[in-house]
């Protein structure tokens, strides 16, 4: 099975280990990975900031780059959601709307692909300790991926998963929201960190690097002893 990887901006610039883990897990599951070097940003930051025409140019480039893929997989629920929004963005342009739909139909978030397409629930990972899961907004509310991360983590040997209080609450990142509405964002992430600490977890695990960088940065500034990990890193662990 051929998988074309969209690594995302944050993985490319800040969390390259997440990209490596994503590839290694998928290859271990029998996938052949392709990485088009022409890939750029999915256009979400520009689109959410109101720069629609600039965003469309990036989106058209991404459609051209990925439309011949068999499956498109990304370690980000937020970016996968943006791919699924492409047909709506181009709703007044039938030609591009059709091409956008073709791309959207074969785009999956990393854990969604493993559980729903590969039909795998245990990847053979092991990581001793206690974890809690942050469920990112776009991934759960818009993409509809709610159970896949928990299913996979429940089968990681040695790992105990505890429910995160107020799990439905946003961490305050929201892309450019954290820059434009900083005081509100800071209050939101403080509340998220309080919830994490309440669980007594050794690890905070999530599927979106934006959320994890936001929460992890706050945890570090507050001097808390919790390790933040992307789920791809956890599923690639053999401790």
Curated annotation (Swiss-Prot):
Source species, domain of life: Bacteria
- GO CC, alphabetical: cytosol
The molecular function GO annotations come to: oxidoreductase activity
Please provide the Gene Ontology terms (biological process) for this protein.
lactate metabolic process
Pfam families reported in the protein's UniProt record: CCG
Q: PANTHER family, per this entry?
A: LACTATE UTILIZATION PROTEIN A, UNCHARACTERIZED PROTEIN YKGE
> What family name appears in the similarity comment?
Belongs to the LutA/YkgE family.
Q: What does this protein do?
A: Is involved in L-lactate degradation and allows cells to grow with lactate as the sole carbon source.
From the Swiss-Prot or TrEMBL record, give the protein name.
Lactate utilization protein A
Q: What is the lineage of its organism?
A: Bacteria, Bacillati, Bacillota, Bacilli, Bacillales
